[in-house]
Each structure stands twice: as C-alpha cells, then as structure tokens.
UniProtKB/Swiss-Prot annotation:
Identification of the protein by name: Large ribosomal subunit protein bL17
GO CC, one annotated term: cytosolic large ribosomal subunit
Keyword Metal-binding found: no
Signal peptide: none
Annotated organism of origin: Clavibacter sepedonicus (Clavibacter michiganensis subsp. sepedonicus)
Record's compositionally biased regions (Acidic residues): 145-157
HAMAP family linked: Ribosomal_bL17
Any GO molecular function: structural constituent of ribosome
Location of region: Disordered: 122-187
Biological process according to GO: translation
Length: 187
C-alpha cells in the first residue's frame, strides 16, 4: 500500500526525487540490475513494479503513462517488448533486492536491485483440498492416529522408568496397546 513520504526527500525536493527515481527505473530496465543505496532501492521498488504492471497491460494508454515517467523511447520499447512477456505469468514481485554490504567511502548500505525474470514455478497445493474432496477416505485416517497416539504416551512413560531395558518397554507397550484394543472391542 503506498504511503505518503514523511521527512526529507531523496535529493532535496519532490521534483528532484521523481527525476531520480525515473532515472533509476530507466537504468534498471536498461541493465536489468543496478547497484545503489538501500534507501534509493526501497523507494525505486514500487515505482518499477508499477511500470512493469503497465507494460504487462501493453495497450497504448499504458505505454503513454510509462512514457510520462521514463522519457527514453528505446527503454520503454524494451520494457514492453522484452521484459513484459518474461514476467507475464508473475503477479507482482518483479524486483529483488539483495544486500551487498557497506560502501567504502561513506559506509552507506549498498544493495543490488534486479528484475526477477525467471519463470514462476507453481506451488503445490496442500493436502487439505484433497481431504475436502474425499471426506469418506478421511474417516478411516482419523481413527488410525487415535490408535497411534496411545503408543507415544506409553513411550514417554517408558522413558521415565529407566530400570527397564528397551526390549521390555516395547513388549510392555505392545501389551498395553493390545489391552486397549480389547477394551474397545468389548464396548
């Protein structure tokens, strides 16, 4: 969500800040990756993302809106013909900021902001959707964990009694599980 900027602007006044961000965006689209300060990169990210979204629309009005920000026709053409098709299936998140360390002269935090041009890998759906589609299959699965939940409880009791050997504890746990199963069948 865009928030109004409070405090000092980049480079002095608001007009100069707009020009600096336009130049940074032009360099980003021209070179696909630029190195700048962290503050400038954080301010550039929403501007660049909005311009890429316009480029994905691809109509004349979107091209004119981008030309109002970036004056270079060659960069706008590259944005609409080369970059937009590469990010067509991506819904936002067109840029990546990577920290590089601090600048030698003034110790300013430096970052690399780059366009994310890799194809999107689809996420695997969780198993919740499969259980919702097959509620009949979910019922036997719900009973099985209840029986298995008794076993860890017995193992924790076995851990407290250190006098018994591991073989004796597993035999005792198996006997208790069988006794519980017999009680369930009697009911």
């Amino acid at each position: 969500m865009p928030k109004p900027t409070k405090g000092p602007r980049l480079g002095g006044g608001p007009a100069h800040e707009r020009l600096m961000l336009a130049n940074l965006a032009q360099s980003l689209f021209e070179h696909k990756s630029i190195k700048t300060t962290e503050t400038k990169a954080k301010r550039l990210r929403p501007v660049a993302e909005r311009l890429v979204t316009f480029a994905k629309r691809g109509d004349l009005h979107a091209r004119r809106r981008v030309m109002g920000i970036i004056p270079s026709k060659s960069v706008v053409h590259e944005l609409f013909t080369e970059i937009a098709p590469l990010v067509a299936e991506r819904d936002g998140g067109y840029t990546r900021i990577t920290k590089l360390g601090f600048r030698k002269g003034d110790n300013a935090p430096m970052v690399q902001i780059e366009l994310v041009l890799e194809p999107v890998t689809p996420k695997v759906r969780s198993s919740r959707t499969s259980t919702a589609t097959a509620p009949v299959a979910a019922a036997p699965v719900a009973e099985a964990p209840a029986e298995e939940s008794d076993v860890p409880v017995e193992e924790t009791d076995a851990v407290e009694h250190t006098d018994e050997t591991p073989a004796e504890t597993t035999d005792a746990a198996a006997a208790e599980v069988e006794a519980d199963a017999a009680e369930k069948s009697d009911k």
